[in-house]
């Protein structure tokens, strides 16, 4: 905590710390995969359900992983009960919807999966998902956790182009506005 010179009050500072972990595929260990019990129930949040159900951009299919397929123009996402909580589910769905705005029939972003371009697209999706999460009033903790994987690429790009973050924020804002328009137009 530091004292604010103008008010004299103590203020807390948050300092992000990047940690590394060794991760192994469960098949490379003698452990058994943890599975959520069948009794685990994650209750949907009605305002989030209404919002996402009102968007008519691409198909949303149940799958084992969350991703957007630009080739087939659909979102795959596990059932809400596979997530630790509803906020994580909706933040992930928001992230994939932001990706879907990059399709050629929508905003037409370059969605090449070469590492630098893909890292930029991920930054757009992370920022856009934060915008949607804030709009819906849900916690964006998972978004922050996912962003650490791309942090090194983003910092390198920011060093090379100081406007990198602002450009990504502009693209994320366009994607967010596009989704809001789709949501409003289908109600």
Regions found by a protein language model. Give the residues of each.
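N-terminal accessory/interface modules of nucleic-acid-binding and processing proteins
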Residues: 1-187
